[in-house]
Amino acid sequence: MALGLFRVCLVVVTAIINHPLLFPRENTTVPENEEEIIRQMQAHQEKLQLEQLRLEEEMARLAADKEAEKEALERVAEEGQQQNESRTAWDLWSTLCMILFLVIEVWRQDHQDAPSPECLGSDEDELPDLEGAPLRGLTLPNRATLDHFYERCIRGATADAARTREFVEGFVDDLLEALRSLCSRDSDMEVEDFIGVDSMYENWQVNKPLLCDLFVPFMPPEPYHFHPELWCSSRSVPLDRQGYGQIKVVRADEDTLGCICGKTKLGEDMLCLLHGRNNVVHHGSKAADPLCAPNSPYLDTMRVMKWFQTALTRAWHRIEHKYEFDLAFGQLDTPGSLKIRFRSGKFMPFNLIPVIQCDDSDLYFVSHLAREPGGGTRASSTDWLLSFAVYERHFLRVTSKALPEGACHLSCLQIASFLLSKQSRLTGPSGLGSYHLKTALLHLLLARRPADWKAEQLDARLHELLCFLEKSLLEKKLQHFFIGNRKVPQAMGLPEAVRRAEPLNLFRPFVLQRSLYRKTVDSFYEMLKNAPALISEYSLHIPSDHASLPPKTVIL
């Protein structure tokens, strides 16, 4: 109780002592001048206002920066959206173009499929309307004039073609037999029977003297054999090598292409009868053949022609005592060109061309031709021209059986070839040859119906043939009839690699040689211009110099 009272008294005393009225604080100072206080407060207020303005400016700048950044982001987003839209549009356009190209390619593949043999030449609508082509306003003689010209000039000039063929074939048989007798079966080439090709064997020869073209296939002696390599078997081939191929000479013990031991791994208990374990195959070894190019296993065309000319010379010297005429090389720039020269002064030319068969087909690799279809020069001496002459003869023979009796297709070709040869003698040779005429005719035969080739339609078909040539010249495009042409009936037996190859343009040299192209076009229209007068002149009178003068000969 006493302790509690003491605590209360202590609190009261403490409160009295600490009351400010009784004991004021010693450190408390009252400002003497209120104006100084007000001035300081105003200065402080101004500082606060300045700071507030600075903060407001800073906030405004930050807001402007944010706005600019926002606008930049929006601009970038807009540009990105536009780029995406343009990229999407471009991708869409590219996709549409690709689809369009695929559709065109599929259509082209279907469009080029070969018709059945019984429908040969029934697609008349696939050709453009060539009969309305102007030919620069030049006109051809009517059918009556053409018929009279054909009977007087062409049929009469080629009446002895059969006798010429018979005589040349008999002599060549004897010559090749003598050649075989001089060759050794163990070391020399094996020469096979000749094959007649071109105009004399397709019945459209028109120029005199009548000229026989004969292929002479040959094979190497054992143990060698030929391995042909087509240009279309390679993915990338230069344009100047299209239509050519190479012929590799291989030994039987080096050729593993047809042997299973070169493709599979034999077990230890299996032995190849052709290639023993001790018989190591040396790929790419140098072929021991004098007809190959230096340091190459491929046949050289120049060496083959030199060998062939030497062999023919030896064979002729062996049998020359049996004949009362001389044999000479006709043209120095055309290997294989021969000429029989009688004592009366008359002569009979013919071509013997060494060839190599391409596998088991009717394609032949030709060393040289007097008139190369491509119109160009070969890239190297190991390039052999691929000839379709046997297929062309077979196609004309098969097609002729489906045409009406007395069809005018060969007459058209003969008249056109006659006009071209006369024009070449007037203005010199051009880039247009008889092979181009025949190629154009083959295309028309495949496109026209058989009924369109009746004899009374000679003038219409001749006009169409010349219009087709005109169109091809203007476009600088004349496709090879067999290479890449899927319209050709499969019954022809054309190799599938050639059938599916890229089409070969026979007029490709015109793209690179402008002067040759201009000369060819001018010569073509000059030929059309001279055709009426030339046909009329030869219909009334056949000049004695129907043939050109014989070139210089070299006696064997």
From Swiss-Prot:
Extracellular face residues: 16-88
Keyword Nucleus annotated: yes
GO cellular component, one term: plasma membrane
TM ranges: 89-107
The family this protein is said to belong to: Belongs to the ITPRIP family.
Species, as recorded: Bos taurus
Residues the record marks as carrying a glycan: 27, 84
Keywords: Cell membrane, Coiled coil, Glycoprotein, Membrane, Nucleus, Signal, Transmembrane, Transmembrane helix
Protein name: Inositol 1,4,5-trisphosphate receptor-interacting protein
Location(s), subcellular: Cell membrane; Nucleus outer membrane
Organism classification: Eukaryota, Metazoa, Chordata, Craniata, Vertebrata
UniProt-listed Pfam families: Mab-21_C
Claim: Transmembrane helix is one of the keywords in the record: yes
GO process annotations (BP): extrinsic apoptotic signaling pathway via death domain receptors; negative regulation of extrinsic apoptotic signaling pathway via death domain receptors
Residues in compartment: Cytoplasmic: 108-556
Highest taxon in the source lineage: Eukaryota
